[in-house]
Each structure stands twice: as structure tokens, then as C-alpha cells.
Curated annotation (Swiss-Prot):
InterPro entries: Aldolase-II_Adducin_sf, Aldolase_II/adducin_N, Aldolase_II/adducin_N_sf. Signal peptide: none annotated. GO terms for biological process: actin cytoskeleton organization; meiotic cell cycle. One of its GO terms (molecular function) is actin filament binding. Has a role in meiosis. The keyword Cytoplasm applies. This is Meiotically up-regulated gene 14 protein. The keyword Transmembrane does not apply. It is found in: Cytoplasm; Nucleus. Transmembrane segments: none annotated. SMART domains: Aldolase_II (SM01007).
């Protein structure tokens, strides 16, 4: 069994790229296993470790559950395909993500899916309540992007979404769904799955209780939990059981680097 704690270090950036693409493909398989797919909607962008002005993104025609490293598409900052599988990808999605990468240069990965509970909760136009300790990683750590009535360009949509994200790790895009960011694919993917479950839990609680009956995590405790949990090593480590599961189920299409 591979070591799952701590971020790996690489002397060779080509090896790091191979590692990154395996983890990216595994994240998509996890999204598919959890039912986060909606047709061709949903995309992940990852900054390339060799040329940091270029990115990797998923192709439109490959199902999340079947994603392989060789399927992923390498593009430059203008959205031009420069390598990888060279299959068609969501150009509008990249235009939005690119603006977020520009505003937050420390962000390596941006994840966005059209998951059921994320879409449902986003329609409320409000942030998550801290109703359990797991979701406290999002305490004062997620924003809201309120969709405007006007029709705008994708780059402008990206700039507005980036404003909603601010310095946080996640943003709820009203009537649309969840976006998360991280310094690794694993961090962003884990945060996305955690936010999706947190939306599900809050919707369950909202349907079963009156406002005054709910018990919130005390702000002091919520802040302490976030400060302890919200770090690149811890969030990367939290995703590794999911990664190893997808490798084991991949019939050799994914590998541990």
C-alpha cells in the first residue's frame, strides 16, 4: 500500500506532471462514482508543473467514470490545444476558470461540477451553516456568487466568480453549483466532495427542523477546526483513500507514482 500522508516531492517535473495527471483522472472517477456528472457539464483545470502558463482540462466526450490520464487535454492561456489527447473541451468553462487562476496564482486546481445537492443548495443564495464539525473547514472560507440578470461574456463571468471566491477555498454559484480550489488536485477534489455532502446534510436538516431547533457549532470551535483542517497537507491526505480506491478499481489505467 502506498504512503498516503504528506505531499510528495519531485526532482523531475515530468514525473510530477505524470503524478498530477493520474490524480486528476482519479478525481474525475471519484466524481463519477458519486454521481456528480450531468451530461458534458463539469470541468477541472490544473496548472501544468513544467509550463505554469499552461493548463490541463478534461475532454467533453469522456465520461467522468472512465477518465484516464491520456484523455486529458493540454491547453495554453489562450485556450489553444497544445498537447495531451487533443479532444474537444469546454472552452467556456476554461474561460471562467482561467480568470480564477489569474486572480489566485497560488491556486493549482479549480474544480466545478453540476452535482445534485450543490445545485439544489445554491438556489437558496446563502452560505452553509456550521451544523457539523466536518463542514467547519468552510467556516468563513466560502463565498457566494449571485448570478446577474444580464448576459455577459465568459471572461467577465470568470472575473465575477473570482470576486465571489475572494480568498476562500470554495464558492457557491447561485443556481449553478459548487466550485473549489486547491494547491493540488487532491485538495480541490476533496473540498468539492465535502461541500457537496455538506449541502446535502444542510438540506436534510432544513427539511426536518425549524430554525430555532438547530444546534450550530460554536463560532470559536468552528474557527479552531478550520484553522487545524484547512492546510494543503491535511486536505491532500484526506483525499488519498479515494485516490487509492480509484487506482484499485481502474484495471491498471491509473497508477501510483
Amino acid at each position: 500500500m502506498a504512503k498516503v500522508t504528506g505531499l510528495p516531492e519531485f526532482e523531475d517535473l515530468h514525473t510530477k506532471r505524470k503524478w498530477m495527471l493520474n490524480h486528476m483522472a482519479a478525481a474525475f472517477r471519484m466524481f463519477g462514482r458519486n454521481g456528480y456528472n450531468e451530461g458534458t457539464a463539469g470541468h477541472v483545470t490544473v496548472r501544468d508543473p513544467i509550463d505554469e502558463n499552461t493548463f490541463w482540462i478534461n475532454p467533453l466526450e469522456v465520461p467522468f467514470s472512465l477518465m484516464k490520464p491520456s484523455d486529458l487535454v493540454h491547453i495554453n492561456s489562450d485556450g489553444e490545444i497544445i498537447g495531451g489527447s487533443k479532444m474537444k473541451y469546454n472552452t467556456s468553462g476554461f474561460a471562467i476558470h482561467y480568470e480564477m487562476h489569474k486572480v489566485r496564482p497560488e491556486v493549482i486546481c479549480v474544480c466545478h461540477v453540476h452535482s445534485i445537492y450543490g445545485k439544489a443548495f445554491s438556489a437558496l443564495g446563502k452560505p452553509l451553516d456550521m451544523l457539523n464539525t466536518d463542514c467547519c473547514v468552510f467556516y468563513n472560507n466560502h463565498g457566494i456568487y449571485f448570478d446577474m440578470d444580464d448576459v455577459i461574456s465568459m471572461p467577465e463571468e470568470g472575473r465575477r466568480t473570482a470576486k465571489g471566491l475572494a480568498d476562500y477555498k470554495a464558492v457557491l454559484v447561485q443556481n449553478h453549483g459548487i466550485m473549489t480550489v486547491g494547491t493540488t488536485v487532491d485538495e480541490a477534489a476533496y473540498l468539492l466532495s465535502l461541500m457537496e455532502r455538506s449541502c446535502q446534510i444542510q438540506l436534510l436538516i432544513d427539511s426536518a427542523t425549524k430554525v430555532g431547533e438547530r444546534k450550530h457549532v460554536h463560532p470559536t470551535r468552528a474557527k479552531a477546526i478550520r484553522e487545524n483542517a484547512d492546510n494543503p497537507v491535511g486536505l491532500y491526505t484526506a483525499q488519498q483513500p479515494n485516490f487509492l480506491y480509484e487506482v484499485a478499481c481502474s484495471n491498471g489505467e491509473l497508477e501510483i507514482i
